Amino acid sequence: LLTPDGIRTAVAALRAETGTDRMCRLVIYPEHISADVMVDGSNTRYESWTYRPGEGATKGIIEGTTSPTQSPFRAGAFDWDAVPALFERAVKELNVMDITSRYLVVSGADPTFGDPMGMSAYLSNGYRHSGYLAADHRGKVTRVMPNDEEY
């Protein structure tokens, strides 16, 4: 699912089930997507949803309210075509060898600290080495946080 088409398919399935693409958190793994989808008419309440290929979108058991560092965003505002290049750059720059996990975290603007909405590409391995690239909603990298541990 970590492809532009995979993400678009999942977001479309979530929108078909929930009636919206407004979320406060979206985490995209190769096998599934977890989303905190905003409740209709609210800027603070959300419900958890999951998308898996072959199963579609399913509502989870978690309901909650946004934290002071979260705000709603529209999934359609992100340039999903930028995702492959983010992960290509992450592999080159994050100093994570023997990668066992990769995922993308998408979040709205942070009203507390003033960070804009964006997406972060994470890599990690079985030795607890990890790093991430943070980018704006168009895919422009704004921060590189490589693994700094010795191999």
Show which residues each predicted segment covers.
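Charge-rich, low-aromatic oligomerization/scaffolding segments with amphipathic character
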Residues: 43-50, 132-134
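Extracellularly exposed regions in secreted/surface proteins, prominently low-complexity, repeat-rich
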Residues: 97-151
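Short glycine-rich, low-complexity/disordered patches
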Residues: 15-33, 92-114
